[in-house]
């Protein structure tokens, strides 16, 4: 169960959540092109239905660049992804994308772009490990993430077809904030992410903020999605907690 405590010393409670969403647009995502578009759009829809203000920033990345589609847009007004705005290509510059976007968000915070008690949620979704970064490496990104955790930022990592905890720990991700999923079950992963995001925002709307320990257990209160087919045959993917390895989508034969 998520732990929380009340916000004191303020006559009003901010219900603003700023979500920085970092989405892999590399060539391997071509296999789940439409699923990724649909899953992201459903995530947007689900968060539109929640109370409070949600500011969404979307950045896509591959070796051609780290491209920010929009920053701090009211989630009620953002454009959906489609095959024109999301076009997978090239290799994975994951660390460069994380480092650049932390710097960009940090600059906006320093400039006073947000209420002082805004909740910052930094979501990273990829189906591959870094193989093309030039500006940042895992150790450099880890230092940046650890620093921002002390300021109350929450970092979440979703990795397809990999051990998300094993990969994520190399650059500072907490076990409870990582999730492994089958690439063919993007919808299930997005559903779980949305449930956890809703719980996170719900605490804010009640005048609560996550404790230090709870901020590293992001998926604790997320709903478990229904089984959804992965790419091949009659194999199905379901989300299951995996002690010591964050949350994991494991596959099993349908009965």
Tell where the protein language model's regions lie, with residue ranges.
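Acidic, low-complexity intrinsically disordered regions
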Residues: 1-255
């Amino acid at each position: 169960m998520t732990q929380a405590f009340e916000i004191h010393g303020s006559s009003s409670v901010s219900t603003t959540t700023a979500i920085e969403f970092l989405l892999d647009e590399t060539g391997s995502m071509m296999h789940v092109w439409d699923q990724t578009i649909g899953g992201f759009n459903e995530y947007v829809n689900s968060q539109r239905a929640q109370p409070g203000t949600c500011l969404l920033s979307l950045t896509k990345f591959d070796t051609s660049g780290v491209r920010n589609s929009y920053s701090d847009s009211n989630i009620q007004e953002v454009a959906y992804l489609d095959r024109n705005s999301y076009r997978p290509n090239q290799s994975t510059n994951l660390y460069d994308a994380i480092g650049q976007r932390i710097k960009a968000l940090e600059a906006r915070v320093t400039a006073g772009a947000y209420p002082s008690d805004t909740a910052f949620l930094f979501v990273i979704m990829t189906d591959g490990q870094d193989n093309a970064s030039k500006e940042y490496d895992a150790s450099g990104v880890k230092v940046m993430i650890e620093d921002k955790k002390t300021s109350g930022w929450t970092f979440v990592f979703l990795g397809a077809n990999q051990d998300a905890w094993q990969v994520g720990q190399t650059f500072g991700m907490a076990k409870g904030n990582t999730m492994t999923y089958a690439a063919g079950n993007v919808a299930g992963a997005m559903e779980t992410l949305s449930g956890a995001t809703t719980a996170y925002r719900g605490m804010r709307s009640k005048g609560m903020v996550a404790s230090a320990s709870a901020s590293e257990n992001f998926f604790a209160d997320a709903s478990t999605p229904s089984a959804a087919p992965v790419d091949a045959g009659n194999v199905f993917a379901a989300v299951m907690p995996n002690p010591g390895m964050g949350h994991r989508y494991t596959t099993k034969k349908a009965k």
